[in-house]
Amino acid sequence: MRTWSNFNLQNSASPLMEQIIFFHDHTLIILIMITILVGYIMINLFFNKFINRFFLVGQMIELIWTVLPAITLIFIALPSLRLLYLLDELNNPLITLKTIGHQWYWSYEYSDFNNIEFDSYMIASNELPLNNFRLLDVDNRIILPMNNQIRILVTATDVIHSWTIPSLGVKVDANPGRLNQTNFFINRPGIFYGQCSEICGANHSFMPIVIESISIKNFINWINNYSY
């Protein structure tokens, strides 16, 4: 999601998103170095008049332009593979949240607790308070505790959706008849916004996601109050 006067990724709210940002910066530096090097060589070749009519085969230079790109790809691939395995690793989740995509809203079930399930609809612009975000706020937010491992089970009832929270580095497809899962760890309190990231029909743009991260003590109080 773009924000006003900002060309960077959103501020991280989870360790995995921090790793994604580090990898993005790492890859971008390598791409900038390659662009500068290739541009410098092309400009030099364009403006000089050196010609070698007898240079037909050069095993050394062929070896160099084969080995150097291979080493560069290794420097990109190794951190990428490490990050891919980290994103799929699941360590003893404290809470499991089931997310169900519908046309065009989300419903949530806290599977570890009784009688905690609700639908989450976007708040219409004419009903939106002045301090809320247009097309991003919902009537029922997801309440989750920070500094705890959270597991998300994602599915859909009609068409393919995608449950996405950029600041947590989470994007999971919601497929009818299939249960996908992911996990994340929220390391600070706050409100984090996301949207459906798979075109799913006429009102695809009106499927926001809002997570409110609170302390474990406040979360237990919320659970107790909601149960009654």
Curated annotation (Swiss-Prot):
Residues 1-26, 83-228 are mitochondrial intermembrane. One of its GO terms (molecular function) is copper ion binding. SUPFAM superfamilies: Cupredoxins, Cytochrome c oxidase subunit II-like, transmembrane region. The keyword Cytoplasm does not apply. The gene is COII. Component of the cytochrome c oxidase (complex IV, CIV), a multisubunit enzyme composed of a catalytic core of 3 subunits and several supernumerary subunits. The complex exists as a monomer or a dimer and forms supercomplexes (SCs) in the inner mitochondrial membrane with ubiquinol-cytochrome c oxidoreductase (cytochrome b-c1 complex, complex III, CIII). It is an enzyme of class 7 (translocase). This is Cytochrome c oxidase subunit 2. Its EC number is 7.1.1.9. Residues 49-62 are mitochondrial matrix. Belongs to the cytochrome c oxidase subunit 2 family. It is a multi-pass membrane protein. It catalyses: 4 Fe(II)-[cytochrome c] + O2 + 8 H(+)(in) = 4 Fe(III)-[cytochrome c] + 2 H2O + 4 H(+)(out). Mg(2+) binds at residue 198. InterPro entries: CcO_II, CcO_II-like_C, CcO_II_C, Copper_CuA, Cupredoxin, Cyt_c_oxidase_su2_TM_dom, Cyt_c_oxidase_su2_TM_sf. Component of the cytochrome c oxidase, the last enzyme in the mitochondrial electron transport chain which drives oxidative phosphorylation. The respiratory chain contains 3 multisubunit complexes succinate dehydrogenase (complex II, CII), ubiquinol-cytochrome c oxidoreductase (cytochrome b-c1 complex, complex III, CIII) and cytochrome c oxidase (complex IV, CIV), that cooperate to transfer electrons derived from NADH and succinate to molecular oxygen, creating an electrochemical gradient over the inner membrane that drives transmembrane transport and the ATP synthase. One of its GO terms (cellular component) is mitochondrial inner membrane. Its main location: mitochondrion. It is found in: Mitochondrion inner membrane. The chain crosses the membrane at residues 27-48, 63-82. Keywords: Copper, Electron transport, Magnesium, Membrane, Metal-binding, Mitochondrion, Mitochondrion inner membrane, Respiratory chain, Translocase, Transmembrane, Transmembrane helix, Transport. It comes from the Eukaryota. Cu cation A2 binds at residues 196, 198, 200, 204. Binds a dinuclear copper A center per subunit. PANTHER family: CYTOCHROME C OXIDASE SUBUNIT 2 (PTHR22888:SF9), CYTOCHROME C OXIDASE, SUBUNIT II (PTHR22888).
